[in-house]
From Swiss-Prot:
It comes from Cupriavidus taiwanensis (strain DSM 17343 / BCRC 17206 / CCUG 44338 / CIP 107171 / LMG 19424 / R1) (Ralstonia taiwanensis (strain LMG 19424)). The lineage of its organism: Bacteria, Pseudomonadati, Pseudomonadota, Betaproteobacteria, Burkholderiales. GO terms for cellular component: cytosolic large ribosomal subunit. Disulfide bonds: none annotated. InterPro entries: Ribosomal_uL18_bac-type, Ribosomal_uL18_bac/euk. Part of the 50S ribosomal subunit; part of the 5S rRNA/L5/L18/L25 subcomplex. Contacts the 5S and 23S rRNAs. Belongs to the universal ribosomal protein uL18 family. The gene is rplR. This is one of the proteins that bind and probably mediate the attachment of the 5S RNA into the large ribosomal subunit, where it forms part of the central protuberance. GO terms for biological process: translation. This is Large ribosomal subunit protein uL18. CDD domains: Ribosomal_L18_L5e. GO terms for molecular function: 5S rRNA binding; structural constituent of ribosome. SUPFAM superfamilies: Translational machinery components.
Amino acid sequence: MMNKKDARLRRARQTRAKIAELKVNRLTVFRTNSNIYAQVFSECGTKVLASASTVEAEVRKELEGKGATAAAATVVGKRIAEKAKAAGVETVAFDRAGFRFHGRVKALADAAREAGLKF
């Protein structure tokens, strides 16, 4: 019998396989109860080009310690878009890592789009 984590990881594997066929940079999101993380991987999937999370000192200062909210995800989305553009990445494929496209994951994606990242 499959538990929630195994089901999420199965969905993530399917998504990552489809993205790997496209040969594009991948924006991946990881969500915990207390933080949210975002990374942009290279086309081959082995090199991290940019990363942002609510663990970073600048983000923590801006959020006053509240790292598990949609507002925090919005800040991380803007930062990942800025860092990706600085690394020369304009277009990515969005990898939600099996999480539902809702709440914090959606807030991060919308903020990254508004900041100029295309996906």
